[in-house]
Structures are given as C-alpha cells and as structure tokens.
Amino acid sequence: MSHTASSCQELVENCAVHVAGMAQEDSRRGQVPSSFYHGANQELDLSTKVYKRESGSPYSVLVDTKMSKPHLHETEEQPYFRETRAVSDVHAVKEDRENSDDTEEEEEEVSYKREQIIVEVNLNNQTLNVSKGEKGVSSQSKETPVLKTSSEEEEEESEEEATDDSNDYGENEKQKKKEKIVEKVSVTQRRTRRAASVAAATTSPTPRTTRGRRKSVEPPKRKKRATKEPKAPVQKAKCEEKETLTCEKCPRVFNTRWYLEKHMNVTHRRMQICDKCGKKFVLESELSLHQQTDCEKNIQCVSCNKSFKKLWSLHEHIKIVHGYAEKKFSCEICEKKFYTMAHVRKHMVAHTKDMPFTCETCGKSFKRSMSLKVHSLQHSGEKPFRCENCDERFQYKYQLRSHMSIHIGHKQFMCQWCGKDFNMKQYFDEHMKTHTGEKPFICEICGKSFTSRPNMKRHRRTHTGEKPYPCDVCGQRFRFSNMLKAHKEKCFRVTSPVNVPPAVQIPLTTSPATPVPSVVNTATTPTPPINMNPVSTLPPRPIPHPFSHLHIHPHPHHPHHLPIPPVPHLPPPPALFKSEPLNHRGQSEDNFLRHLAEKNSSAQHH
C-alpha cells in the first residue's frame, strides 16, 4: 500500500505542475487555487478525477483543467470514480504518457465512462433504469455524465480488492473487465435502441396543418382496423339477426326493426282488407265496391250492362265504347288508329308473317295465342261460355253476346240515328260510317273507297284473281265464302241418292200403255208450263231445300241437256243462333238462297 501511495503522490505532483503551467499561459482565467484537494461532492463540472480508496474510505484528488466553468445544478451532482491499478501498472502509465499515442488511448478510456449514459423510459415517459452506454450513441449521452448504481459500485469495489490481493492476475482481470464491458455495451445498445424508438414516438414534434391543428403520429386507420377486427363476428351475427325480420302479413324481409314497423304502419294498418277473399285496397270506397260485387266479375256498366272484373277495365270501357275517348294512337304501317298503345301493339301482329302458334290437332297456324285457343274449341267441343239466365252454353263469346240480346230485349250496340242494333262492335262501327259517309279504306289499284277493311280486301280479289276458298268435294276454288257455300249445296244435291217423295213429283204427260223413262219423255212430249216464281213453287212448312226447284226440267232451247233427277224434300239448315235469324248481309236466309237460284237459272238461259 505504501508503494501505491507514493506513486499516487508523484503522479499528483506531476499533474499539478502541468496544470500550473496551463494556468499561467491563460491570462483570461483566474488564479489557481492553493489546494487541489476537495470533497467528493463538487458543484464544478470536472473533466478528470482520480480516486483512490484507503482503509475503505474513498478520497478524491482533484486536477482542475476548467477553472472558470459555471456551477451546475444540484440535481446533476454525481460522484465519479476511477479504478485503481497495481504499482507496476501506475509506473506503466507514467511511461506511456511520454508517448502521444498512449496518452490518447488513455484519454479515450478515461472519457469512455464519463460521456456515456443510457436511460430506459417506458411509454408513460417514466424512467425505468439508468446504465452505461457507448460513446456517441446519442446526443444526450454526450452531455450527461455517467451514473453508476449501487450494484455496479459494489462490483467495482470487489474487483479492486481482488486486484490488491493478487497482482499476478492483473492482466487477466483487465481482459475479463473488457469482456464484461463489451457485454454490457451490447446490452445497453439494445436498450438504447428500444428507448430511442419509444422516445422518438413520444417526444417527436407533431406536424401541423394549415389551421394549426396537430396531426396524430399513428394513422387512424390502424386504430379503426384494430377495433373492428374483434367486432367482425359480432357484426355478422347482427346482420344475420336483421335479415330474419320478416313481416307476419306478407313475405317481405327487412334489415332493421324500424323499417319493419314503418312497413306495418304504412302498408298493413292503413290498407283495407276484404274479409272474403283477403284482397287489399287503399281506399274504403274501393273496398265497398269490391264487396258489393261479391268478389266476382260483377262490376257492370250502367249503359250496356257489361260486366268487368276490375274497376279500371270499366273506366276504359266507358271511355272507348260510349264515346268518351279518342283514338290518339295510330299504326305506323297502315295508319289505323286505336284508343291505347296496348291495342297498337296487339295490332302489329297482323303485319307480321310469323305464325308461331300451331294447332296440334289439325296443324293450322295462328299469329296470336288467343286465336289458337279459340280454334282449339272446335276440336274439343267445349262450350265454356254459359248464359246466366237460361244456362245455355256456347262455344264462343260472341255467340253468348248475341244470345244475351234475347234476354235484354235489344242488342248491345244500338245506332242512335236509325235505331238499328248490333251484337258486335265491328258491325256497329261499319254501320255508323254509313251515316257519316266516311270511307277511309281505299283500293290501291282502282281507287275505290270502302267503309271497312274486310270489304276493301274482298274487292281487291277482283283485281288479283285470288281464290282463297277451295271446295272439299271437287277441289274447285272460289273468290268469296258465299260462293263456296252455294257451290257446296249444289255438289251435295248432285251426289245425294234419288228418293223423290210423291208430294214433290211433277206430273208428266206420257202414254199409260208404254211407260217410257223420264229422260225420253221429256224430249218428245210437251209439258205444262212451270211457274219459275220460287215463292209460288214452295209449299208450306216443312220448307223444302232452297235448291230443290233448280234443274227439274230442261229448257226447250237445250234439247241435248239431261235433266237432273228430283231431290228429296230436306229441312233447311238450322240457324247459327236462335236470336240471330239474319245472315251477314241482313237478309233472310231463304230469300238469299232463292236469289242465288234465280241468278244461276238466268246464267243457264244465257
């Protein structure tokens, strides 16, 4: 110990001489203090300190290099210690100071512990631990002195005692100390990095916007995602619950209960529901009208007693049929006018050549599905239209309409000018044009005008020579349907068996002894004149067939003409409807057939 004390005194004297020379050179600094021994607690910022422990009580030897530095705050007072070495080490230090390289290394070792400090701070900016650090790790560590904890001081004391007891292991101890220091430095580096990242996050200046509001460092999206992620299953469950909110009175589904309640208040509580059929109405008047009709098709027109199922159908009927509406919509092809656009679309099918609806029984094609449906009634024999007054059934609707005129007393459509009534609106419209003189349909070939389109088409066949009506018996074709009908009657009488009743036989003057066939007798013997007036030749009912008076006797101008045998007395064909004894021309059927007979007879004379 005496050797170490003497070496320390010599070292102190050398340092004091050096310091005194520096003080004399610097004229701006104050006087050098007389004594260099001070207490352990100093308020000055000391650059170098050398401590030595004697008899367990440390004392300090002060070497002043900064005499005029201001005093520091009391909170920054920290004791600094230096490790003691063996006598041999002290002499080595003296020799090394003569060399500049050794002195620089020594100064770095001395300033190593003085300039480095690591402060561990948590997220709340609270100090957790203070430890050593590397040189130049952070700007704060350069300015603050090194703080040592009590545990580190105890370790150093134990190390100094160990070095005093054994000088042989001095070099080994240095290496171990260096290794420990390296380990501590590595640990402190990690801690400083963590503390620096936390401090940067907490103490970094927040950016400002143009309005001076601070922006948060962490983006708000991350916070929202972090909060939404755990709530995702909960939200899905809520959505599933919302989707199950169904209305009890209708199959509608709602997302929230608010929408369901609103739907109940608006739709079901305010709607008027029929007790019989459950149909809903917005107005009470509509419900009362519906109940008066007993939920059936009984909404009748006051003018024509036509029944409808819906109220808007009745309004449309009143506008169209009874003259309250105008035909504002016209066809682009034929310029035909209609009351509604729906009627125009339905009419456009007539201009197309496609017939997609085909009858499975006979193969006939139609343009409209309704036409096929009506046609199929011919094969099935079904009569879906029933009269409510007499329970008579009909195959077509227009037949029922014609039949209803018997119960009503007049037909549905009546002319206000002449009082003539019609069962179908088509015939009524054609009749009204006779009063107005309107003939909108003009023949493209000759320019003749007609009141209806069917009449114009019928007239056009005279120019084109078209004969669309073939006979099923002989295959002959005709231009008009009435001509085909007359031809069928003629063919039927030619092919029928000859069974002439005695009431219809015409007496012929022949010799009783020699009976001769009527074919020969008609050519040689004179016959009484026959009145060709068809009215006088027809006996009372049962009326013979209208064509029975034709070709009974040949004319004298045609001697080679063979007479046709008489035809049996057949009843006339029944009328199409009981309530419609008139044909399409408005004449009696018998008169019409007689007119045809006269026409044919006159043609034969010529």
From Swiss-Prot:
Start-end of Basic and acidic residues biased regions: 71-97, 171-183
A Pfam family assignment: zf-C2H2
ZnF locations on chain (C2H2-type): 245-268, 272-294, 299-322, 329-351, 357-379, 385-407, 413-435, 441-463, 469-492
One biological process term in Gene Ontology: regulation of transcription by RNA polymerase II
Expression sites (tissue/organ): Widely expressed with higher expression in breast, prostate, vulva and pancreas.
Record field: transmembrane: none
Modification sites for Phosphothreonine: 103
Residue ranges, annotated region (Disordered): 71-113, 130-235
Extent of Low complexity compositional bias: 184-209
Region (Mediates interaction with CBFA2T3): 498-606
Biased composition, class Polar residues, residue ranges: 137-149
GO function terms (MF aspect): DNA binding; DNA-binding transcription factor activity, RNA polymerase II-specific; zinc ion binding
Any one GO cellular component localisation term in the record: nucleus
Protein family membership: Belongs to the krueppel C2H2-type zinc-finger protein family.
PANTHER family: IP01243P-RELATED, ZINC FINGER PROTEIN
Subunit organization: Interacts with CBFA2T3.
Reported function: Functions as a transcriptional repressor.
Entry protein name: Zinc finger protein 652
Native source species: Homo sapiens
Lineage: Eukaryota, Metazoa, Chordata, Craniata, Vertebrata
